[in-house]
Amino acid sequence: MARGECNCGAVQFEIDADLTDVFVCHCSICRRSTGSNGIAVVVVPNDRLRWVQGEDHIVMWSKPNADWQTWFCRVCGSPVPGRNDPARMFVPAGSLTEGGDALRVAHHVWVGSKAVWDEIGDS
């Protein structure tokens, strides 16, 4: 069992799955959305994530003319789990508070779009 929450704690969730793989997206949309080098997510089946509280605090935004959406807490603005796919949830790895001890970066995606200052190391 894994647990997570937004920065202010208004949105909380549980995941009934063993979490191991982190996907780091370096596309320009994810970089702008986070203000960083991209976003690190854990992908879980929809039926494995349960909202504990604050589902009514979640705001979804779709980028016009793009197949991209983001979900965030309306109180603190932190990214929260969301769906860009009918079967899977994309859980921001940094939002996990428990159950993420086995997580390791397994894949970097959209590396060709990474920021010029972003260096991806071997360790």
Language-model segments: residues:
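A short Gly-Trp-Pro
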Residues: M1-S123
